[in-house]
């Protein structure tokens, strides 16, 4: 069985909340999802890629503006091959500020942070998440607003599947 992870990251990728605020938000996330398996906070000294695992379905190139579907179940899927290579690169590249990647659509190199992951991935220095929250509805607007108030920033939701 796969794991579902609700990830919450600041819309401002450079925003990092106070440690106490992050811990309060983590505790509240556990209250919101009492059946969830593990709530976590993660801080980073630099911007990191926040992935969605197998939920990544589409990217849009920042250079040629073409959208490309990513289907790992389709044989010889160029988008999926590109994603697997990128995933390896991201795990071994400590500096996303200078990382350029070859785009599968136009063959040109784009800054990784300029690629549009169509809402299913992001970049951030802070992440709040809960594993297997067991909620079909996700987080409500009221709950999201409460977490945003504690952390002092607007949040973006990313659902990941591993």
Spans of model-derived segments:
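N-terminal alpha-helical interaction blocks
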Residues: 1-59
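Generic beta-strand structural signal
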Residues: 57, 99, 124-126
């Amino acid at each position: 069985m796969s794991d579902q992870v609700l990830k919450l990251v600041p819309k401002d990728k450079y925003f990092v909340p106070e440690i106490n605020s992050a811990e309060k938000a983590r505790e509240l996330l556990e209250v919101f999802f009492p059946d969830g398996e593990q709530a976590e906070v993660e801080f980073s000294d630099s911007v990191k890629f926040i992935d969605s695992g197998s939920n990544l379905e589409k990217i849009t190139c920042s250079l040629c503006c073409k959208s490309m579907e990513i289907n790992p179940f389709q044989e010889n899927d160029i988008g999926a091959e590109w994603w697997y290579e990128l995933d390896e690169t991201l795990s071994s590249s400590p500096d996303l500020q200078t990382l350029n990647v070859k785009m599968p659509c136009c063959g040109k190199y784009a800054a990784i942070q300029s690629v549009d992951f169509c809402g299913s991935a992001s970049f951030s220095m802070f992440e709040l998440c809960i594993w297997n929250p067991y909620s079909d509805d996700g987080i409500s607007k009221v709950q999201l607003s409460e977490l945003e108030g504690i952390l002092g920033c607007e949040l973006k939701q990313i659902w990941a599947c591993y």
